[in-house]
Design a protein with these regions (language model features):
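Long, compositionally biased intrinsically disordered regions
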Residues: 208-218
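Long, Pro/Ser/Thr-rich low-complexity/intrinsically disordered regulatory tracts in eukaryotic proteins
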Residues: 184, 204-210
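A short glycine/serine-rich beta->alpha loop
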Residues: 45-57, 92-102, 143-149
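Short, cysteine/histidine-rich loop/knuckle motifs that typically chelate Zn2+
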Residues: 2-8, 16-17
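C-terminal domain-closing interface element
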Residues: 155-185, 199
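Conserved mixed alpha/beta catalytic, RNA-binding, or beta-rich assembly cores of soluble enzyme
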Residues: 61-74, 80-82, 86-134
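A structural-propensity feature for long, helix-poor, extended segments
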Residues: 118, 122-169
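Polybasic, low-complexity association/targeting segments
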Residues: 29-65, 150, 185
Length: 218
């Protein structure tokens, strides 16, 4: 078995060192070492880390970083510095953004990934790059807007990464790996505001709560 973050041999999903990482360094470490082209699968692994919050700001850099990493792993032209830039930029979006600012940050994080990959600026020569970023963000926002009930960061992450896998394949010149079947959330028992069977990612067999997790609201 290899550590899901640093990819070094480990007897547990996360090695002793990586199990102690806070979310930002966890995301960086995993993005630097991952070879996966499946961003949903990557997100499921990292959100299962014992120190990854149940909700909140951590989900924003998760989305941006994993998309740049998956793009790079699929043969796209992206480097470690760009990966780190996407992570850092998305981490500036505060928790609770979805409720207070009129846009879900998971969707914005998708646009951040595209902007970093394309090197978008405000100049005319980057109009196409901005359009690509805005299109993915907009599509993500529309999907999230059609969700009902309590806000859920996991639901937003699954929604936009599933979308982005298809978007990147269609428009970004690389083939990301989409989920092979229906995505099932393994975190419903950790969320006191879980929408249960009303959520399209609610598992057929709901998981039993394994233990306490950081509950950062956002």
């Amino acid at each position: 078995m290899s550590c899901l973050a640093c990819a070094q041999p480990s007897t547990t999903p996360f090695c002793e060192s990586c199990a102690k990482l806070e979310y930002l360094e966890l995301i960086r470490t995993s993005c630097h070492h991952s070879t996966s082209t499946n961003p949903v699968e990557m997100a499921q692994a990292l959100m299962a880390h014992p120190r990854f919050p149940a909700a909140g700001q951590a989900h924003h850099p998760l989305v941006a970083g994993l998309l740049v990493a998956a793009y790079r792993n699929a043969g796209g032209d992206a480097n470690i510095a760009e990966m780190d830039a996407a992570i850092q930029r998305a981490n500036t979006i505060p928790g609770g953004f979805c409720a207070g600012f009129g846009a879900d940050a998971a969707a914005i994080a998708c646009g951040i990934a595209v902007s970093v990959i394309e090197g978008a600026t405000v100049k005319a020569e980057h109009a196409v790059a901005r359009s690509l970023a805005h299109t993915l963000t907009g599509q993500g926002l529309l999907l999230i807007a059609n969700n009902h009930g309590n806000r859920c960061c996991k639901r937003s992450v699954f929604t936009v990464l599933e979308l982005a896998a298809h978007f990147f394949t269609a428009t970004m010149g690389v083939a990301l790996t989409p989920p092979s079947g229906r995505v099932e959330c393994a975190f419903s028992a950790e969320n006191k505001l879980c929408n249960g069977a009303d959520c399209k990612f609610y598992p057929a067999v709901p998981p039993v709560k394994a233990g306490p997790r950081l509950a950062v609201l956002g």
